[in-house]
């Protein structure tokens, strides 16, 4: 067997005559994988009982780490080959094979029919309840290429068809230094889904690539600044980000567990550095599981994180352990949810029902600290 096979060659191989193992972490695998692939993280390969009598094809995100693993398996006597270009290349070809016109209509119907209650109604509820849109707004719908932002774009299109007042939309994609394959996947998905994107380029990935301490935080801050700046240049007064309900819950717990404070991700914010601009989060009430269900139902595949770190698989943990504090919190919430399915909603409600007279101390927006001892003996 060749040391490397292409995506085209893999498609020609009869299923059952080979084993395809995906060595990405479980979170990436769950968001999308090649049909028939089995998830085996590198640290578990010794326990996987791989077959000696048929080919083993190894896949990672971009074909880099999987190449090293396939070479090691060959040394151990297996008929192992690396999938050239990895999952990203397979995904790009899958999207290219689909028919845009019919698929876009099917995707739109799914939003208004099957997912009307679980997704579109919650989108509209957040818009109304948190007053995210006003007549005359021009919104930059910020698209990263992932499932959340792509769905948000379709929801905004649907909302505009039934609008009660006039507002404008710009579907804004910032390329911070994507690989050519990741850029192609974003553009192909946009064509497939009927989203007219406006793309602009920055060099953010180059700027943060060698940063040792918390490069993801710096990258996020820089990306938001560039999005605000481009949106303002295009005449927008708001940018929309695709954070969903689960992001909100995770942020609440992260602020407590790692930050020592009670703070949440707000549904809208005034920009501190771009006067007159606001950030809105219209996916605020939509559960991530429903977004995943929508993507699976429509056979849609999206990039998870297209930064240069994940391009080279350097963030893949050998033992499949959590890669970030947010992933650790996700796992904690999943564990809590096993014993009490209401725990997630209760966390959300807790920040809607804060009783200041039951808080030891709190800060006002200007930083002034108030203690429960203030006026205690009055």
Q: Each PLM stretch: what is its role?
A:
Residues 1-19, 25-55, 61-113, 188:
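Rhodanese-like catalytic fold shared by cysteine-dependent sulfurtransferases
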Residues 29, 91, 206-212, 313-315:
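A short acidic, helix-capping loop that chelates divalent metal ions and anchors anionic groups
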Residues 39, 82, 171, 199-201, ...:
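A structural preference for short, hydrophobic beta-strand core positions in alpha/beta folds
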Residues 99-254, 258, 262, 266, ...:
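ATP-dependent adenylation/nucleotidyltransferase module used to activate substrates
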Residues 105-110, 222-234, 267-274, 329-350:
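Short, basic, helix/turn surface patches
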Residues 168, 247-328, 332-333:
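Catalytic subdomain that performs nucleotidyl-dependent activation
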Residues 300-378:
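The feature marks non-catalytic terminal segments
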């Amino acid at each position: 067997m060749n040391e490397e096979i292409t995506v085209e060659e893999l498609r020609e191989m009869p299923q059952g005559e080979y084993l395809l193992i995906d060595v990405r972490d479980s979170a990436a695998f769950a968001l999308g994988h090649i049909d028939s692939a089995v998830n085996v993280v590198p640290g578990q390969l010794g326990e996987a009982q791989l077959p000696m009598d048929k080919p083993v094809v190894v896949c990672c995100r971009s074909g880099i780490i999987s190449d090293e693993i396939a070479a090691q398996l060959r040394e151990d006597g297996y008929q192992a080959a690396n999938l050239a270009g990895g999952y990203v290349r397979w995904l790009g070809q899958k999207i290219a094979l689909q028919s845009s016109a019919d698929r876009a209509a099917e995707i739109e119907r799914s939003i208004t029919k099957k997912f009307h209650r679980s997704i579109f109604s919650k989108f509209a509820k957040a818009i109304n309840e948190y007053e995210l849109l006003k007549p005359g707004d021009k919104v930059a719908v910020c698209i990263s290429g992932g499932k959340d932002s792509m769905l948000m774009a379709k929801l905004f299109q649907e909302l505009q068809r039934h609008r009660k007042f006039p507002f404008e939309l710009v579907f804004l994609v910032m390329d911070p230094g994507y690989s050519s394959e990741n850029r192609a996947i974003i553009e192909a998905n946009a064509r497939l889904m009927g989203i007219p994107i406006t793309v602009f380029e920055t060099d953010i990935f180059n700027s943060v690539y060698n940063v040792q301490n918390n490069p993801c935080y710096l990258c996020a801050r820089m990306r938001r600044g560039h999005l605000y700046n481009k949106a303002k240049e295009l005449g927008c007064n708001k940018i929309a980000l695709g954070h969903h309900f689960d992001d909100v819950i995770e942020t609440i717990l992260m602020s407590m567990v790692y930050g020592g404070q009670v703070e949440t991700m707000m549904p809208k914010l005034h920009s501190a550095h771009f006067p007159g601009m606001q950030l809105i989060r219209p996916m605020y009430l939509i559960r991530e599981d429903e977004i995943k269900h929508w993507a699976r139902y429509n056979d849609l595949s999206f990039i998870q994180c297209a930064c240069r770190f994940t391009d080279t698989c350097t963030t893949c943990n050998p033992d499949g352990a959590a890669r970030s504090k947010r992933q650790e919190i996700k796992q904690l919430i999943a564990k809590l949810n096993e014993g009490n399915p209401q725990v997630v909603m209760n966390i959300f409600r807790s920040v809607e029902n804060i009783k200041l007279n039951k808080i030891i101390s709190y800060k006002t927006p200007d930083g002034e600290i108030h203690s429960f001892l203030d006026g205690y003996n009055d």
